[in-house]
Amino acid sequence: LGYFRNPRFTAATTAITLVFFAMFGSYFLFTQYLQFVHGYSPLSAGLRILPWALAYLLSATQSAKLVERFGQRAVVASGLAITAVGGGLLALTSSVDASYWWFAIGVVVQALGMGITTAPSTGAIMRSLPLHKAGVGSAVNDTTRELGGALGVAVMGSLVASHFRDSMSTAVQGAPIEASRSLGEALQVAVVTGGSK
């Protein structure tokens, strides 16, 4: 843990954690949003996420040039800000009747930010340690990615599940009595058959 006394090391690991928090949490939600809200098949939903991968690839490969021109700190900070803007666009434009193109714009913006953040942050982790500690740097880099990803899925999944639960209770309250009864009966069937194979 002594490595975290180095501000450069700590800032870089924090940036990686935040990027992978957003990345994995978003992936988790993207696939469900495209399939369950817009009705795309799993394959079709996966293809609709390809703009994210292309934008990430493009920006990640250009990040070294950006660091040379503007400096590592400015590029990483800008990348995190762009990632947040992309996430904000997705939050504001992802609804039942929203066009796929708004979603595509949001994921591209988010991916551009993630791409320019990841490589410089990884480089900063590795450069902040002595050469004989490169294995430690690599392990911490991988661990922070996994930690960020796991937290992203857990937190974003919990937020969506909570919102869904609250929305369903409000929707059921305004539904005709027959609809409310059928939901109760469906729940009973699910409980009874849940353990059977």
Predicted regions: what they are:
Residues L1-H132, V136:
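Transmembrane core module of solute transporters
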